[in-house]
């Protein structure tokens, strides 16, 4: 099976995804066969777009895949659109590869340093912002955060989250009398935990000189 990571406007279309599966399983396909397989789709128009983008190859009235499959993870950049076969040798390397992201804000000098997988399925704030912005499917845990934050402005959220976290410069425990969605979000993300007394404690490494919080 072929997987598409970080799909574009074209490659996230349901028809394109189905077409990739179909062409991957059939050889020497002609346009009439594609139209018969997808009777409710504007095949001609969309096929021209895919051919123009270099994703589908047309030769002698036959159609085939022309996807630039990932062959190595050496120069792979986070958020890069890639096509990969699940049975390829590089697929396992892709799943095991990790990246580091940094979130900064305009209110203070705090930095949220987070470790993530390429698919951005790990529970981090950077991954949440990225997926919501691009309308990508959320994991179950990310949906839990969405129920609290929704489609929040990242700068707005970072302002309040980092301001809260920076209070740990002076205190080991923090009390929040009223409900605070940003404190709740930090709990879901794993930055803080609530002890038996209902007070919040820091649950990640904190470099006080660099004002950096490390979510691994």
Can you name each region flagged by the protein language model?
Residues 37-52, 172-189:
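Short amphipathic alpha-helical interaction segments
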Residues 1-9:
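Short, Lys/Arg-enriched N-terminal segment that forms or immediately precedes the first helix
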Residues 11-33, 85-177:
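Short amphipathic alpha-helical interface segments
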Residues 51-62, 183, 187-199:
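A short, conserved structural fragment
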Residues 69-104, 206-216:
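Short, amphipathic alpha-helical interaction segments positioned at domain boundaries
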Residues 28-81:
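N-terminal interaction modules that seed assembly of large macromolecular complexes
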Residues 62-68, 198-205:
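Minor-groove-contacting beta-hairpin "wing" of winged helix-turn-helix DNA-binding domains
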């Amino acid at each position: 099976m072929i997987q598409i990571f970080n799909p574009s406007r074209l490659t996230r279309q349901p028809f394109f995804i189905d077409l990739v599966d179909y062409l991957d399983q059939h050889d020497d396909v002609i346009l009439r066969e594609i139209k018969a397989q997808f009777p409710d789709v504007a095949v001609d128009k969309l096929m021209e777009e895919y051919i123009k983008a270099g994703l589908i190859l047309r030769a002698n009235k036959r159609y085939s895949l022309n996807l630039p499959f990932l062959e190595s993870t050496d120069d792979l950049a986070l958020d890069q659109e890639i096509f990969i076969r699940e049975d390829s040798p590089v697929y396992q390397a892709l799943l095991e590869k990790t990246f580091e992201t940094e979130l900064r804000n305009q209110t203070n000098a705090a930095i949220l340093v987070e470790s993530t997988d390429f698919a951005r399925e790990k529970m981090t704030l950077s991954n949440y912002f990225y997926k919501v912005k691009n309308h990508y499917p959320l994991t179950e845990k990310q949906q839990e955060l969405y129920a609290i934050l929704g489609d929040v402005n990242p700068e707005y959220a970072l302002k309040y989250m980092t301001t809260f976290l920076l209070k740990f410069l002076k205190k080991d425990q923090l009390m929040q009398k009223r409900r605070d969605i940003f404190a709740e979000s930090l709990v879901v993300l794993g930055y803080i935990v609530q002890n038996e007394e209902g007070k919040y404690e820091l649950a990640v490494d904190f470099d006080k000189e660099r004002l950096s919080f490390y979510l691994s």
